[in-house]
Amino acid sequence: MKRRIKQGGVCVLAAALMFSVFALPNTYAAPGIETDRECSIEVIAAHDEFSELQNLPITVKLYKVADVAVNGEYTPTEAFQSIDFSDVDSDTVAAVWEEKAALAKEVADTEEVTADAEAVSEEGKALFEAMPTGMYLVDAQPAESDYNTYEFKPYLISLPNNYYYGTGNDEWVYDLTGDNAIGLKPEKSDLYGDLIINKTLEVFNATNEGANFVFQVEATKTDVDTEEVRVVYSNVVSMTFDGTGTDSVKIEKIPAGADVVVTEVYSGANYELTTDAEASTIIIANSEVEVDFSNTHNGGQNGGTGLVNTFTYNDGEWTHSATEDSTP
């Protein structure tokens, strides 16, 4: 049996970065809904705080979760019968609607429900036309730029919508475009890549013990929107050789787009660089980038060794450890 939302049900408006629930009080009853009228929705993907969204192709899916009657009552569609709308009214807070939107997305994902409409944003906008009246789940899919990933909160939107509390006008709005377009609520996070430091020892002096080499690694990333520069990695790593050859050390999960400077700060007793002491690169998402250093023996006989000090911040405390070699 289909449940019906009690009379005086809800009308949901999702404005840019906002999730608002609008309901007409009984004393301001709106004219009846034209349930056979076609509607349209313009979804604005572009965002003032996240400039990359203007040009990223973002797939937006609409799922019809409920039909609407002339008097504004909603009846859940077959695929979304498990979502209870009977406890909502004009006093329902946004957090409750967010919870119901999350439940609707869970149903859509786990039950592999086919979207009623799908569009890809162009120049920061996705347009849906000829949409039947009802309540819809707006589900924008994650999108990636070169260095960042964006995820979007799902929400519910009513077609038609009503802006009585904002404008005092109780007319139903069937075209949510232009000034009535709806926005997305994005969350930005880093993509990551790995750094590999390659070291080649061309000549080894067997008279001395192992040859130790220490590298200072500094990585900074500039935010594409705020231009704020933040340190995303700062540490030292080392390698120990007991003969000639090439060895490597990998540093994983450095934010993509970070500018990395690797400096060989200790070349071991009696060894000198045959390459520059500093190498730079940019981290690429889901990839490995490499820098290379080479050394040779300088003919000296002085002994020497090296330790790598590592400081780790965990649960409010710094811990320290010292190792002779950072290689696996």
What residue ranges belong to the model's regions?
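Solvent-exposed loop/turn and edge beta-strand elements of beta-rich ligand-binding domains
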Residues: 1-328
